[in-house]
Structure formats: structure tokens, C-alpha cells
């Protein structure tokens, strides 16, 4: 029987904790207003993740992780045609183009990024189906959820704190009144002065 609900009632943290503690195997689909995320787990560990709007082919993930430059990415996409990610991975390894670790670490980084993005969702419908495995042509990894949950929770708290400090990105920027303070006597780097020069009531946080 599928576990279904809304993130307003059952948060991403609670979902991942349940999957982790119960050592669940299956797929989790989360649908937001504008995008959807698909995750797969095996015995409570993340094995595959996909943002429905993104190109999640192996070649593109390797390009995003800077294992392939733009030219290499384009050539491989054209040359690889319709071969699967597993086949492409083996070809790249056998040709000494990349190592197995290069490929697995790039995939792991991408999958973790999908999870971290999901932590920012406060609304959306989810459905967990038991014993559903990733497509057989995809390369899987095994990522412990414990550290992801702790890191995701930490980032969420930081974001909530930031929202308390800056409730709207449309807020105007201005200096506070400090009588006697002369900016000419302040030592700042070039980049810091660029930021200072942007502070103007006409500008917002955007």
C-alpha cells in the first residue's frame, strides 16, 4: 500500500526519517506546483534521484560536475546517441576517459543536490511505493540519509532565520544612521566596496 500525503502535513524531514529508520525500499515521488522530484531508496539509503525538469543524463551530470567540458559534453551527447547511462559509463571507463570514482562521485553529488533542493519545499503531494526500483539503464549509488537529514535540517533553519531577518527581498537598502562615521576611513576590499556602492534606497535585495 502506497504512503501518500501533503508536505504541509508530513514534511520532507519526516519522510526521509521514516524511510531511513524503517530501511524502506521503493520510490518516492514529490509533486510541487511547478516541478516534480523522483527518488529511489534501497534498505533506507538513497540510490537514485531525478528532478523531472532537468536533463539527468550521465553526460550532462558529468558536465555539471566539471568532469567534462562543454565541447566534450556536446561531442559525447552526439556520439553516444541512444545508449544507456550504464553503457556510456563503461565506455568512458574502458577508454580511460574517466574513472569509476569520477562517475560515482558526480552522480552522488547530483543526487544529494536534488535532495537538498527538496528540503526547501513546504508544499507538495508525495507518494511512496514499496519495492519500486530505478530504471535498469541507470547507474545507482548508496547514500546514507542520516547526514543528508541533518544537513538539510540545518539549511532549513538557516533559511527560516534569514526570512525572520529579511522578510522580503523587496526591502529597500540603506545605511543606518551612525553620526561621526566616515566611510572614507573604512578599509574594505574592492569586492566589498562594490557591495557598498549598491546600497541605495532605490535598490532592493533582488
Q: Model-found features: residue ranges?
A:
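Acidic, Ser/Thr/Pro-enriched low-complexity segments and adjacent helix/loop capping patches
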Residues: 1-206
